[in-house]
């Protein structure tokens, strides 16, 4: 009886392995025929150290990542000389959330990328944004002891028109990269 059960498990494991291998092979073949584009400039992404780049080197050098010091409420960058923990906006305006964090300064390249992502069906950009959020803010998210990533819902009519909720796609990628639970509403 035990031998039959092991044989079934081995067969199931082999099936899963072959399916995963086929999916990986199809993805790699698709990447060769239709190489992914840089989520900032739209150029073809090359390889670095045998792996496909997430972003082209020129755009990577131009992106402004937000590090410390940052506002303890909304995550906006603060000047290195600031002794305050909050930006001006957060001292004069009440927010309906506890904490926020931003990965990038909202400069031209990112503005255009976000616009393409939201309004021109560039769903594939979610992987880049999710990975960057995990890399740049993962330690902070871990420090906050977050156990669930919940995307901001969209108005139903907007989501029907667009076909997807970009916050949901990023939340899925972020949770995958940080091994957190994610729920979609």
Which ranges hold each PLM region?
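Glycine-rich phosphate/pyrophosphate-handling loop used in enzymes and phosphotransfer proteins
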Residues: 1-183
């Amino acid at each position: 009886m035990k031998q039959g059960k092991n044989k079934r498990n081995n067969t199931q494991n082999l099936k899963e392995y072959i399916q995963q291998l086929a999916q990986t092979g199809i993805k790699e073949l698709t990447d060769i025929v239709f190489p992914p584009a840089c989520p900032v400039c739209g150029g073809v992404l090359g390889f670095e150290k045998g792996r496909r780049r997430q972003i082209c080197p020129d755009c990577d050098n131009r992106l402004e990542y937000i590090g410390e010091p940052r506002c303890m409420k909304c995550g906006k960058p603060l000047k290195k000389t600031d002794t305050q923990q909050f930006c001006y906006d957060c001292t004069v305006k009440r927010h309906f959330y506890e904490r926020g964090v931003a990965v990038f300064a909202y400069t031209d390249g990112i503005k255009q990328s976000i616009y393409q992502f939201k309004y021109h069906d560039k769903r594939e950009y979610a992987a880049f944004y999710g990975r960057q959020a995990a890399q740049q803010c993962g330690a902070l998210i871990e420090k906050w002891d977050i156990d669930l990533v919940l995307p901001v819902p969209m108005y139903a009519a907007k989501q029907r028109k667009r076909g997807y909720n970009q916050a949901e796609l990023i939340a899925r990628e972020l949770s995958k990269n940080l091994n957190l639970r994610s729920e979609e509403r």
